[in-house]
Amino acid sequence: MVGNIIPFIGGEEEKSEKEPLRIWGHIDEEKGEIVPATSPVITCQCVRVPVLDGHTAAVFVKFKKKPTKEQLIEKLLAFEGAPQKLNLPSAPKQFIQYLEEDNRPQVKLDVDYENGMGVSVGRIREDSVYDFKFIGLAHNTVRGAAGGAVLCAELLKAQGFITKK
């Protein structure tokens, strides 16, 4: 597959568009089911590129109130989720790093940021249709699968959902 790009990954685009809305949704207590959020609007196109590890995304965002580029970068760098606030063992200390070089993030250089548990963002620039566009990079097996599962377990334990019998 070296030297080739596959322009379709079955089921990946639908999953990428719907799964975040389920995560950002809420649980209907009466029905006992997840009600997905209705915003933001997410659309994507997935392409398989031959790299060992890492998912790279071209992201386009529009805000209700457009921030400056500097404000956007400041908010990304300041982001702190429950895993950081609880200082969980697997949690990256700095969840998002912003790389100023115009040729970053790169899989070879940046996929292992924060032991693979962090997200690298670069090339933030204004867009003619949306407010901004940027490139994001995350480790698909560390952050996205194995490490993500460990971090979820740590969070559930810290929040009291997992206890000893």
Predicted segments with their positions:
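Flexible, glycine/charged-enriched surface loops at secondary-structure junctions
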Residues: 31-38, 84-92, 163-165
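Generic structural motif recognizing short loop/turn segments at the entrances and edges of beta-strands
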Residues: 1-3, 38-40, 92, 115-118, ...
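C-terminal helical cap and adjacent loop that interface with cofactors, partners, or active-site loops
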Residues: 83-84, 100-165
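Terminal hydrophobic/aromatic helix or amphipathic segment near a protein terminus
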Residues: 66-110
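Active-site-lining helix/loop region of Rossmann-like oxidoreductase modules
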Residues: 1-80
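Arginine residue identity/basic-tract feature
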Residues: 22, 48, 69, 93, ...
